[in-house]
């Protein structure tokens, strides 16, 4: 008689907006990780939705959780709680719950009470984001931002004390957490660099023409227009640079958001600055990344950033805000700035002396296969070894 196949242990990835991803962030991380781990685990991924239910996407079980969108982080905390309760009811034999953002630490308490193995990813120093955003918020909303920042600080503490393991996505964040909270089990696991589909030169020129751009005649930033991502710094700096080149900023624009209103006001009548809104078509994103004069990454908080890793594949000059987690990735192969005036000087240098940089060797430890193997070991160490498949990813 043939032996029955050993069922794969069930794991849940909780806290992203869901799969398939658009670009960057937790969604890309969850998608790339789940499609590699599904050979060894029965993977559940929670998805923000307008309904409840479970379906499949590329062999991964999507758990749809009704969620209300909001500019603060209070609702995601509730979303994680609902997702945890739903999974405990619908996937009763799930072995491990992995919360991909620090606010999941509150929900990890529930999973621990239900005797599940738990992991929480602290992401960046998330509570600092709210303090930066608060400066641009309406006065009557600032107490809410302050309260949310405090909730995230508590979440950071819980993320280091409640789960069976805590994940830091950069060595600088790991050092910070170890010094401040002394987690019982602290692991380093970064993100991977997504490879976009190749686009032939004729198609690239066509895409650029539609966007009103020319090859190597624009600076580029791809990211959410939120205060901690520092886009106001680059607009302020670029306006002081005498150049016919353009500044292209790609990211979803909420025209009611006070920070977006600030960016539009700061841009003024400068026609060189183009706020293109969200662009998710891979061929267009590839074309923009491949043909920029330089890429500006003004993010001030966070850990390893997937959008930055993605840009490094193109070997265009990168100008980054000077923080340890950017230096950790880019090393000496980048321009660094702390103020708008420093950025002005860097852009003037690039204008007169453009150069390319080879970042590929930096990316060896940032491939998704490498990252998935790291996570396999972490998950495997927490789940009953007799129930895990020992084969290699």
Language-model segments: residues:
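N-terminal strand-loop element at the rim of the active site
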Residues: 2, 6-9, 16-22, 36-71, ...
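Conserved donor-binding/catalytic core segment of Leloir-type glycosyltransferases
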Residues: 12-14, 208-229, 235-242, 248
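Short, structured helix-loop element that forms part of the nucleotide-activated donor/catalytic region
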Residues: 54, 203-206, 246-272, 276, ...
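An aromatic- and histidine-rich active-site surface loop
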Residues: 75-89, 94-128, 303
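Membrane-proximal helix-turn-helix segments that form the acceptor-binding/catalytic region
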Residues: 145-166
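Helix-loop-beta element that forms the nucleotide-linked donor phosphate-binding surface
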Residues: 173-194
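Aromatic "clamp/platform" in nucleotide-sugar-dependent glycosyltransferases that forms part
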Residues: 300
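Short hydrophobic beta-strand element within catalytic cores of glycosyltransferases
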Residues: 313, 317-320
């Amino acid at each position: 008689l043939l032996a029955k196949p050993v069922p794969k242990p069930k794991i849940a990835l909780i806290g992203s907006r869901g799969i398939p991803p658009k670009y960057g962030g937790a969604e890309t991380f969850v998608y790339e990780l789940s499609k590699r781990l599904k050979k060894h685990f029965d993977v559940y991924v929670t998805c923000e939705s307008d309904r409840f239910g479970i379906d499949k996407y590329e062999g991964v079980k999507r758990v749809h959780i009704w969620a209300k969108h909001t500019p603060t982080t209070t609702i995601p905390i509730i979303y994680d709680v609902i997702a945890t309760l739903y999974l405990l009811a619908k996937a009763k034999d799930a072995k491990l719950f992995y919360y991909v953002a620090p606010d999941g630490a509150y929900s990890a308490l529930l999973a621990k009470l239900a005797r599940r193995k738990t992991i929480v990813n602290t992401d960046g120093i998330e509570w600092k984001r709210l303090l930066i955003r608060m400066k641009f918020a309406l006065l009557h909303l600032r107490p809410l931002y302050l309260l949310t920042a405090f909730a995230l600080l508590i979440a950071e503490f819980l993320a280091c004390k409640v789960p069976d393991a805590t994940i830091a996505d950069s060595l600088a964040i790991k050092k910070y957490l170890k010094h401040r909270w002394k987690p019982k089990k602290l692991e380093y696991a970064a993100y991977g660099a997504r490879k976009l589909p190749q686009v032939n030169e004729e198609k690239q020129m066509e895409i650029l023409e539609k966007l009103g751009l020319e090859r190597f005649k624009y600076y580029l930033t791809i990211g959410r227009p939120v205060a901690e991502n520092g886009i106001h710094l680059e607009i302020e700096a670029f306006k002081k640079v005498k150049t016919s080149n353009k500044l292209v900023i790609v990211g979803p624009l909420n025209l009611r958001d006070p920070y977006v209103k600030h960016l539009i006001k700061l841009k003024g009548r400068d026609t060189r600055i183009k706020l293109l809104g969200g662009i998710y078509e891979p061929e267009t994103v590839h074309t923009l990344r491949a043909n920029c004069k330089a890429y500006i990454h003004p993010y001030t908080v966070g850990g390893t950033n997937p959008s930055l890793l993605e840009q490094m594949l193109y070997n265009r000059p990168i100008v980054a805000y000077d923080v340890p987690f950017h230096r950790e990735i880019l090393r000496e192969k980048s321009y660094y700035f702390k103020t708008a005036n420093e950025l002005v000087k860097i852009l003037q240098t690039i204008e007169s002396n453009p150069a390319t940089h080879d970042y590929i060797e930096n990316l060896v430890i940032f491939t998704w296969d490498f990252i998935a193997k790291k996570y396999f070991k972490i998950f495997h160490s927490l789940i009953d070894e007799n129930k895990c498949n020992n084969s290699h990813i």
